[in-house]
Regions:
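N-terminal periplasmic/intermembrane-space "pro-region" immediately following the signal or transit peptide
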Residues: 1-64
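Residue-level detector of alpha-helical segments with a strong bias toward transmembrane helices
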Residues: 14, 19, 70-71, 76, ...
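Outer membrane beta-barrel
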Residues: 47-70, 79-81, 85-201, 211-226
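Outer-membrane beta-barrel proteins
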Residues: 70-74, 128-131, 158, 203-205, ...
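Solvent-exposed loop segments that connect transmembrane elements
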Residues: 75-85, 201-212, 264-281
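Detector for outer-membrane/organellar transmembrane beta-barrel domains
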Residues: 214, 219-282
Length: 282
């Protein structure tokens, strides 16, 4: 009887221990659902929502290699032949460069309109001279207001020099500058711009950075329709106290064929930030 009672007590004890272990067992939680990146199609293709925000981001860029030669683009190289007992000599050869461009775009809807940004950084190796890095764009825009690093409105508002090869044969305007600008866009093809700009310390080899609190000023107007468009833009260089202006006419012959004519004028034969060409007319 005592042995039987002992066996039953042991069984009860083991059962109690087993129940306690079951009560203390670690329960493995279900895995958290994975939050995949959401596609944002508000601003076009390639955008996605930054996780945890309503800001859309697009990342892009390109790789470019360019080689050129001839009288307009070739470069002169000096060969050191003194080690061979000769004299230095010069030869002409082609110019070349390789470029990596990294770009970002962001967009967010606010009560005041679309808040957007754009950046572009370029890494370039030219003619074996080492790598150079440049910040070409870094601006913020809210509605029609834009601030930051951009290219001068005097150059961009009229459409640069068109979609042509070697558009820099005749200088037509400045590029790098910090600016504060506002662009008005009407519903009938009319638009206008005003831009306050700081200039650049190195534009076509000259220093046009502002020297006091008076900025350079750009103003322009443009009318665009299906047949083409007309644009006029003027600028005041506050450092040299001179001005320049450009007018451009675009004609679209077909969906793939177009032509334009552009003319520039400055009030002085000397150069200024907005008149990189020699003489008054260009």
């Amino acid at each position: 009887m005592n042995i039987k009672s002992l066996l039953l007590g042991s069984a009860v004890a083991f059962a109690a221990v087993g129940g306690a272990q079951a009560a203390d067992a670690v329960v493995v939680a279900d895995p958290e659902p994975v939050e995949y990146v959401r596609v944002c199609d508000v601003y076009g293709t390639g955008y996605f929502y930054i996780p945890g925000t309503e800001t859309c981001l697009r990342i892009g860029g390109y790789v470019r290699y360019q080689v050129s030669g001839g009288d307009l683009w070739e470069r002169t190289r000096v060969h050191d032949d003194t080690l061979l007992g000769g004299e230095d000599r010069t030869d002409e050869t082609y110019s070349q460069y390789s470029r990596l461009s990294l770009q970002t775009w962001t967009g967010t809807e606010t009560e005041l309109g679309t808040l957007s940004t754009y950046t572009e950084t370029r890494f370039q190796w030219a003619n074996g001279g080492g790598t150079t890095t440049s910040l070409n764009f870094a601006w913020i825009q809210l509605g029609g207001f834009r601030v930051g690093k951009d290219e001068s409105a005097y150059t961009t508002f009229a459409g640069y020099a068109g979609g042509v090869i070697a558009d820099d044969l005749v200088p037509y305007g400045p590029f790098d500058t910090n600016l504060i600008s506002y662009t008005f866009t009407g519903g009938n093809g009319f638009s206008a711009i005003i831009s306050l700009e700081s200039g650049s310390a190195d534009s076509y080899g000259h220093d046009y950075d502002i020297t006091d609190y008076v900025p350079h000023v750009v103003a322009g107007a443009k009318f665009t329709q299906g047949w083409g468009g007309v644009s006029l833009v003027g600028a005041y260089d506050s450092v040299h106290e001179t001005w320049a202006a450009k007018a451009r006419l675009d004609v679209n012959a077909t969906d793939t064929i177009s032509a334009f004519i552009m003319a520039g004028y400055g009030d002085d034969d000397d150069f200024n930030f907005y008149k990189p060409w020699g003489g008054e007319w260009a």
